[in-house]
A protein has these predicted regions:
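Flexible loop and strand-edge segments within Gram-negative outer membrane beta-barrel domains
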Residues: 275-296, 302-363, 369-389
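Short acidic/polar hinge/loop motifs at secondary-structure boundaries
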Residues: 62-65, 166, 182-209, 297, ...
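C-terminal beta-signal and adjacent terminal beta-strands/loops
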Residues: 599, 648-656, 679-761
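N-terminal periplasmic accessory domains that precede
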Residues: 92-96, 141-144, 161-166, 178, ...
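Gram-negative outer-membrane beta-barrel transporters
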Residues: 449-453, 547, 551-555, 575-656
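Short, acidic, small-residue-rich periplasmic hinge/interaction motif at the N-terminus
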Residues: 32-34, 42-47, 74-80, 90-134, ...
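Membrane-embedded beta-barrel scaffold of Gram-negative outer-membrane proteins
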Residues: 364-376, 481-483, 490, 523-576, ...
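Extracytoplasmic beta-strand/coil segments of soluble accessory domains associated
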Residues: 142-183, 203
Length: 761
């Protein structure tokens, strides 16, 4: 017989054992791809229990509170093969997902304003992740886009290195840039606003080539770039990316996250770029690269709400001080005629957010506001401008059988003021008249799934511009895919509409080297566009081959083409009395070998021209053929990656000042090539180094000079005739005036770089 206290202890142990056995358990671990790269935003779920989680930036997940028993767990990520696992107790798992195609990974939101698989989108959208941009590290997103097929960052000035983004041959003002779907980088900020976006906070970049005016308004005529930022919950606790170059450039990216309570998370990022070493390798007494001192601060807040409804607010502030010019220029000479310099001070703030209304129907309210102040001198010419843009949009998503409907309304207000005649009173130039433009609009989208292979997207947008009146932008998209989804065909037709602001879009109008002349009142541009896209996926044994081909055609009326050639002392602006065309074909190839070798390459052939008075003229600064490549190899056992990236451009037509101008009328074939080696130390640290512009190519190759009359930037020693034309003299044998706009590529030659990345979960 057991004593009474032993009986009680025995009973307690039985109850405790039963209690322990009935406890919930957890499953946790890490998920990577076939090359050992961690995968974030992977869904890990037990469907029958409706318990789920997602991986963070380091690929880790933790599924808690799983009831005792045997369950089937699913692991899935768009672009990878789904796997299923039986679980019955606490486990630490290391899982590997097999990629279907790196080119098809992830979700897209740009085409229809809702998240869906890129393969299911009726609109062709290209997606680029941070891994793509890390293959060729750059201090700004503007430079990072250079290895995307059909996208070319164009430098517009040899002195201040301002630039814009060309898509399929169309100039920067035709490209709309969004941050989290908000139109933040536009108007005045298209010149310098793409700098200072912390790349450590970018989740992905979505690119649409061709008009997207139905959803995003009149600026999205040539294409659209949507920068999607990370959410705090998918980011490491701390990360940094620091690199420098042999030219003395230093770029620092810092990011951290923190929480306020259980339902508020914040992501904070800082980007700092500094370059303060004047270099003149082409011996023209002008800086080859603009000196810059820039800081950008980004902060995003995510709020957890009941029913997982969206609520996020973000802001960004940028300050930049940049200058370029004669090598002995100092700030004391800013705005003087003693020494030529271009000095630009930029202050910019942005605020934007998304809020899902607390109701059963899906209503999403989005808002943004930004202010941009640019105080600049181009030689002795002052350009002082302020721009404030506010934007609000309400969208309603509704599903009716096979119809995914989207109804939205938006309002945009733009305030613009500067010290140029653009904001002067028409009758009294001394009277200031800031420009206030209101743009209310409404748009409708119907994504109609005909069957498993056919989908139709119909869209219509109506805007009312307070200056130019009614704007209609319809669009039709059709998508077909084979039963096995290895073949996809997309067709789109629609139109675009754009109101131009010369002084915010064309840097050449500000340099002071030429007089700006308007022949008539500038009318809005209109365009019609067609795009045919075909995607083919092939699996050859363990090798994957993806083909993505497109044909595009855009027809313009009232196109605004700056005339540099009629008078070398003027830029003449007028609407084209004929028409303009941008047409071409492109091909992207994604090749993945099982041994770790990957190739992403593309080529675009295009013809961009205008016709006026039956005279066909090729567009300036536009290549007929461009190619890009990204070749990478991973030594898995060593933790080493090698990336060889580059681009190739065919000759472009360039503006000459006179028949005597000795510079070449067409650029040569030219290429920028880069090599990088990355060594990984665990999942926390990477060290990378390499060389940029391996061929040491610069535009002065084959030219006697790039900047005309760099020795006389204020034209003090130029003799003019009665018509204002420069005369050839012994001191000026070619009859030229100062002009820094003969530019088609970077003046920065070969340089080494070294950097490291570090992150803490």
């Amino acid at each position: 017989m057991f004593p009474i206290h032993k009986k009680l202890l025995f009973a307690f142990l039985i109850l405790f054992s039963s209690f322990i056995n009935a406890q919930d358990y957890s499953v946790y671990g890490k998920i990577t791809d076939q090359n050992g790269e961690v995968l974030e935003a992977v869904t890990v779920i037990i469907p029958i229990l409706k318990i789920g989680s997602t991986t963070n930036a380091l690929g880790h997940f933790n599924l808690k509170d799983i009831p005792k028993g045997t369950w089937e767990m699913e692991i899935r990520l768009l672009g990878f093969k789904k796997i299923k696992i039986k679980i019955d107790k606490e486990k630490n798992l290391d899982l590997v997902l097999e990629s279907i195609s790196e080119a098809l990974n992830g979700v897209v939101i740009t085409g229809t304003m809702k998240e869906l698989s890129r393969a299911d989108s009726p609109i062709p959208i290209e997606v680029y992740t941070p891994k793509f941009f890390r293959a060729n590290p750059t201090p700004s997103l503007f430079e990072g886009l250079q290895n995307i097929n059909g996208v070319r960052p164009q430098i517009n000035c040899n002195v201040c290195n301002t630039g814009d983004i060309h898509i399929n041959g169309l100039e920067g003002p035709y490209t709309m840039v969004l941050i989290d779907g908000m139109p933040l980088v536009s108007g005045l900020s298209t010149v310098y606003g793409l700098n200072g976006i912390p790349q450590s906070l970018i989740e992905r970049v979505e690119v649409v080539k061709g008009p997207a005016s139905t959803l995003y308004g009149s600026e999205a005529v040539g294409g659209l770039i949507n920068i999607i930022t990370k959410r705090a919950q998918n980011s490491p606790s701390f990360s940094t990316d620091i690199f420098g170059t042999g030219w003395g450039e230093l770029n620092i990216d810092l990011a951290t996250k923190f929480s306020l309570g259980k339902k508020i998370q914040s992501l904070l990022g800082v980007n700092y770029f500094n370059y303060q070493t004047p270099i003149d390798n082409n011996n023209d007494n002008f800086t080859d690269l603009t000196l810059q001192n820039r800081i950008s601060v980004f902060n995003k807040w995510d709020f957890q709400r009941e029913g997982y409804k969206l609520f996020s607010v973000a802001g960004r502030y940028i300050y930049e001080d940049r200058w370029g010019g004669e090598m002995d220029w100092t700030k004391e000479k800013r705005g003087s005629t003693e020494i030529y310099g271009e000095s630009i001070y930029t202050k910019r703030w942005e605020l934007f957010g998304t809020y899902q209304l607390p109701m059963d129907e899906k209503f999403i309210f989005q808002f943004s506001a930004n202010g941009h102040h640019q105080n600049s001198y181009y030689g002795d010419m002052l350009y002082d401008a302020n721009q404030n843009i506010s934007f609000a949009q309400l969208t309603w998503f509704k599903t009716l059988e096979n119809h995914e409907l989207l109804l939205g309304t938006s309002y945009r207000h733009t305030f613009y003021d500067d010290n140029t005649p653009a904001t002067a009173d028409a009758k009294n130039i001394d009277l200031n008249r800031p420009i206030n433009t209101s743009l209310p609009g409404i748009f409708f989208l119907d994504e109609y799934t005909l069957n498993n292979q056919n989908k139709l997207l119909l869209g219509m947008r109506y805007d009312y511009n307070s200056t130019h009146g009614n704007i209609f932008t319809p669009r039709v998209n059709y998508k077909w895919n084979s039963i096995d989804k290895q073949n996809t065909l997309r067709l789109s037709v629609g139109n675009g509409y754009r109101v131009a602001n010369i002084f915010t879009e064309d840097h050449a109008a500000l340099t002071g080297a030429r007089e700006v002349v308007f022949i008539n009142k500038i009318k809005p541009e209109t365009s019609w566009n067609g795009n045919l896209n075909y995607v083919k996926k092939l699996f050859i044994g363990d090798t994957y081959l993806g083909l993505d081909s497109s044909a595009f055609y855009t027809y313009f009326n009232n196109k605004i083409i700056p005339d540099y050639e009629t008078d070398p002392n003027k830029i003449i602006y007028n609407n084209l009395e004929g028409f303009a065309v941008s047409k071409g074909v492109s091909l992207n190839i994604d090749l993945i070998f099982p041994n770790g070798l990957k190739l992403l390459a593309g080529v675009t052939a295009m013809d961009v021209y205008s016709v006026e008075n039956n005279i066909r003229e090729r567009q300036l600064f536009t290549e007929k053929l461009t190619a890009t490549w990204n070749l990478g190899y991973t030594f898995k056992n060593l933790g080493i990656n090698i990336d060889y990236t580059g681009n190739l451009y065919s000759p472009m037509r360039l503006p000459l000042l006179s028949d005597l101008d000795p510079r070449t009328e067409f650029s040569p074939w030219w290429s920028i090539q880069n090599l990088q080696i990355t060594k990984r130390f665990g999942n926390e640290m990477e060290v990378y180094f390499g060389g940029k512009n391996l061929l040491n190519w610069t535009p002065d190759k084959g030219n006697p000079f790039i900047i005309a009359r760099s020795e006389d930037p204020f034209d003090k020693n130029v003799t003019f005739d009665n018509n204002g034309q420069a005369l050839a003299t012994p001191d000026n044998p070619y009859g030229l005036t100062f002009d820094p706009t003969y530019v088609f590529g970077p003046n920065q030659g070969f340089r080494m770089f070294l950097g490291f990345r570090y992150q803490i979960l």
